[in-house]
């Protein structure tokens, strides 16, 4: 006698994407550290031309401070205190990578046991960028002279959310670099900050809007964003969702 085979039918609902506006408010200062063109040049000179690392240049705290931030408006031509101050007075705007905010949320949800793995959380929501780039120094490789030139004030593609804040301040930190040596870093710090996130999710997906908000909230508390964040044994970059 032939055994009857049972069949099951599964309904796959079409994705229904919706967006929500979420305001996150900083609970602790946000420290930013964009990749410095000078540091990148040292790496590339060794890898492209086989040059040994040059004697370290004298530190310029003001320049390092300005270069550490993601400028949404053009940087001043001269990275000195007076020029930077004028840009602040003229309403200079700054951003932060959307990917870092999303990663904080995913890491927190995974560590809290809300998902079996991080991969399943990545398509659950997207953070839509306010702008798709920022101003900073970039590099140009010259094979004829075997040199790498720094090109200032270049618009570099990267998804960014705008930081709503008082003008940033310069902070000085003692850090340990990869070889264990001590170094001093000068970076931008935003003390009273917020961001308005545009979050897109699938209404017919596994996670509801409330779930997504809880995941983002957990990211702000358990992981944080930026340098010396809670995820990295620090106290900075924590945030919460402002209730409507």
Give the label of every model feature segment.
Residues 1-244:
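RNA-interacting cores
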